[in-house]
């Protein structure tokens, strides 16, 4: 099983590439890699990013966005990695701006997926916060690839457009025994400042 860290966004609201923001004296991407490795679930953890940022990662497995679909958001990142690993059946997706994700969250979502997979024939299993879906923390089967490709080719670039066409299920973030901020994504500098305060409470 492969894990994909989506790190190709422009980060214009944050002011710099969020992958290289720091929490607990680690870059976001390094912290997420460490967490994913601790699960022992993945035979490879891949950073998906754009050509401008690729050389800045001190990491072996970096895939650059497909040249035909650059600057099209998270769908491009997922597509670009899946395209390189068409023999893989399942991918875990996480956005680089979710640095506090925990191994309990990854394991919890995986077990939720396995317990529902056969009965529901699921394509995507991800988290939700109440009624709000969080598709950038989830498991995607390879069966999603043609739908992602079609969406990119037709410039329907929202993940919502894709998962509406597929069999999906959602696990509420409150089901995970982790600090309440584990799934929070960082969009602005004040989000990071707030997160640091919450960690130190």
From Swiss-Prot:
<keyword id="KW-0460">Magnesium</keyword>
<keyword id="KW-0808">Transferase</keyword>
<keyword id="KW-0547">Nucleotide-binding</keyword>
<feature type="binding site">
    <location>
        <position position="65"/>
    </location>
    <ligand>
        <name>GTP</name>
    </ligand>
</feature>
<keyword id="KW-0342">GTP-binding</keyword>
<dbReference type="InterPro" id="IPR025877">
    <property type="entry name" value="MobA-like_NTP_Trfase"/>
</dbReference>
<keyword id="KW-0479">Metal-binding</keyword>
<dbReference type="InterPro" id="IPR013482">
    <property type="entry name" value="Molybde_CF_guanTrfase"/>
</dbReference>
<dbReference type="GO" id="GO:0005737">
    <property type="term" value="C:cytoplasm"/>
</dbReference>
<dbReference type="GO" id="GO:0061603">
    <property type="term" value="F:molybdenum cofactor guanylyltransferase activity"/>
</dbReference>
<protein>
    <recommendedName>
        <fullName>Probable molybdenum cofactor guanylyltransferase</fullName>
        <ecNumber>2.7.7.77</ecNumber>
    </recommendedName>
</protein>
<comment type="similarity">
    <text>Belongs to the MobA family.</text>
</comment>
<dbReference type="GO" id="GO:0006777">
    <property type="term" value="P:Mo-molybdopterin cofactor biosynthetic process"/>
</dbReference>
<feature type="binding site">
    <location>
        <position position="97"/>
    </location>
    <ligand>
        <name>GTP</name>
    </ligand>
</feature>
<dbReference type="GO" id="GO:0046872">
    <property type="term" value="F:metal ion binding"/>
</dbReference>
<keyword id="KW-0501">Molybdenum cofactor biosynthesis</keyword>
<dbReference type="InterPro" id="IPR029044">
    <property type="entry name" value="Nucleotide-diphossugar_trans"/>
</dbReference>
<dbReference type="Pfam" id="PF12804">
    <property type="entry name" value="NTP_transf_3"/>
</dbReference>
<feature type="binding site">
    <location>
        <begin position="6"/>
        <end position="8"/>
    </location>
    <ligand>
        <name>GTP</name>
    </ligand>
</feature>
<keyword id="KW-0963">Cytoplasm</keyword>
<dbReference type="GO" id="GO:0005525">
    <property type="term" value="F:GTP binding"/>
</dbReference>
<comment type="function">
    <text>Transfers a GMP moiety from GTP to Mo-molybdopterin (Mo-MPT) cofactor (Moco or molybdenum cofactor) to form Mo-molybdopterin guanine dinucleotide (Mo-MGD) cofactor.</text>
</comment>
<feature type="binding site">
    <location>
        <position position="18"/>
    </location>
    <ligand>
        <name>GTP</name>
    </ligand>
</feature>
<feature type="binding site">
    <location>
        <position position="97"/>
    </location>
    <ligand>
        <name>Mg(2+)</name>
    </ligand>
</feature>
């Amino acid at each position: 099983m492969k894990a994909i860290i989506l790190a190709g966004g422009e980060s214009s609201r944050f002011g710099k590439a969020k992958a290289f923001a720091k929490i607990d004296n680690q870059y976001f991407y390094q912290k997420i890699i460490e967490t994913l490795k601790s699960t022992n679930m993945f035979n490879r953890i891949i950073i998906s990013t754009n050509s401008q940022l690729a050389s800045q990662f001190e990491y072996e497995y970096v895939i650059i966005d497909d040249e035909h679909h650059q600057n099209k958001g998270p769908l491009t990142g997922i597509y670009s990695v899946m395209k390189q690993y068409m023999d893989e059946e399942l991918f875990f997706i996480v956005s680089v701006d979710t640095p506090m994700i925990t191994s309990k969250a990854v394991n919890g979502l995986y077990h939720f997926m396995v317990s529902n997979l056969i009965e529901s024939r699921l394509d995507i299993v991800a988290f939700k916060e109440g009624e709000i879906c969080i598709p950038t923390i989830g498991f995607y089967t390879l069966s999603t690839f043609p739908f992602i490709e079609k969406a990119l080719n037709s410039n329907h670039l929202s993940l919502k457009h894709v998962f509406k066409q597929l069999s999906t299920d959602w696990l509420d973030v409150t089901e995970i025994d982790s600090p309440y901020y584990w799934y929070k994504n960082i969009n602005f500098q004040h989000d990071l400042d707030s997160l640091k305060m919450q960690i130190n409470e």
